[in-house]
Amino acid sequence: MDTFLFTSESVNEGHPDKLCDQISDAILDACLEQDPESKVACETCTKTNMVMIFGEITTKANIDYEKIVRDTCRGIGFVSADVGLDADNCKVLVNIEQQSPDIAQGVHGHLTKKPEEIGAGDQGHMFGYATDETPELMPLTHVLATKLGARLTEVRKDGTCPWLRPDGKTQVTVEYKNEGGAMVPLRVHTVLISTQHDETVTNDEIAADLKEHVIKPVVPSQYLDENTIFHLNPSGRFVIGGPHGDAGLTGRKIIIDTYGGWGAHGGGAFSGKDPTKVDRSGAYIVRQAAKSVVAAGLARRCLVQVSYAIGVPEPLSVFVDTYGTGTGKIQDAEILKLIKENFDFRPGMISINLDLKRGGNMRFQKTAAYGHFGREDPDFTWETVKVLKWEKA
């Protein structure tokens, strides 16, 4: 039997790039909560003892940017210089301007356009992907890497592994077979975890705790065997982490945010962007489309692409590929027609249909760590499977 190996990685909420994503989305949440029409493009960068937010925000909301930055850092666990950043004593720099009036006029007519008339906030192309290899209809490599990272955070915050610090990375390699274009996971080949830790713990204790409290609860036992390889803090020491260890920047973990290297990616990041930015809203609607196709049993894998021009509401193109896994109910050309009939790709209508103007409740901040897709949370409206209506031959 021909098999192949495929790998996906994830990073923890305390990774400096992910810290930046969460700050950018915390600011988006605050703006949308007070003013659902807020136009937000908020970037964050960080290094030792410093966080800077910069970008373009037009909103009626009254926002204390510095407080949001400090609260977000503190919530993640950055409470002292020892762990990589001190939320209460670091420098916070704010350089926020208003959205360009040229863009405002072209996209939403300075808020005068009806929802169906709102144009895309920029050009670009986005991809949505789904696969039947997991209940989440997501790639197993990505699901496991992401859940391992989330579990690391859980056992750090609940005191199970008090030696853990916020920064960390995970990576999972799975052996697959290709079954007529569908991906069938056979076993987990390698599990890699590199986690920040305090000075007190030994490498043996780290390995034992990670196996018992992180890997065992996350990786289903049927995928593990005597040949599974475990690399647990293989560099030997990871005390210095967070922004002290590496600089961080919003939008540098776009594959972790999506499908772990499966499917395709148009290159646009999500965090800190309001729903007129099709990098985000377009990617969300095509995930819902691809997921709905697989959930309907029309294909075992599905990739959907959409593309836009700035200021133009209708998409320039919609593409679908089922990798030859169509179940024979209808062909790809008909699936494409079905997608166009069942999903409205105009940005203003995506915002309404997926309720993307609603902030608060950490709505978007939650998306900024451990993946935007495959999550069971009512706030992730794009994960709702839409029942597709079509004429059965």
UniProtKB/Swiss-Prot annotation:
**Could you state a single Gene Ontology molecular function term?**
methionine adenosyltransferase activity
Residues annotated as binding ATP are 15, 167-169, 235-238, 246, 252-253, 269, 273, 277
Cofactor dependence is on: Mn(2+); Mg(2+); Co(2+); K(+)
Keyword set for this entry?
Answer: ATP-binding, Cobalt, Cytoplasm, Magnesium, Metal-binding, Nucleotide-binding, One-carbon metabolism, Potassium, Transferase
Q: Which GO terms describe its cellular component?
A: cytoplasm
Function as written in the Swiss-Prot or TrEMBL entry: Catalyzes the formation of S-adenosylmethionine from methionine and ATP. The reaction comprises two steps that are both catalyzed by the same enzyme: formation of S-adenosylmethionine (AdoMet) and triphosphate, and subsequent hydrolysis of the triphosphate.
Name the record gives this protein: S-adenosylmethionine synthase 1
Gene name linked to the record? METK1
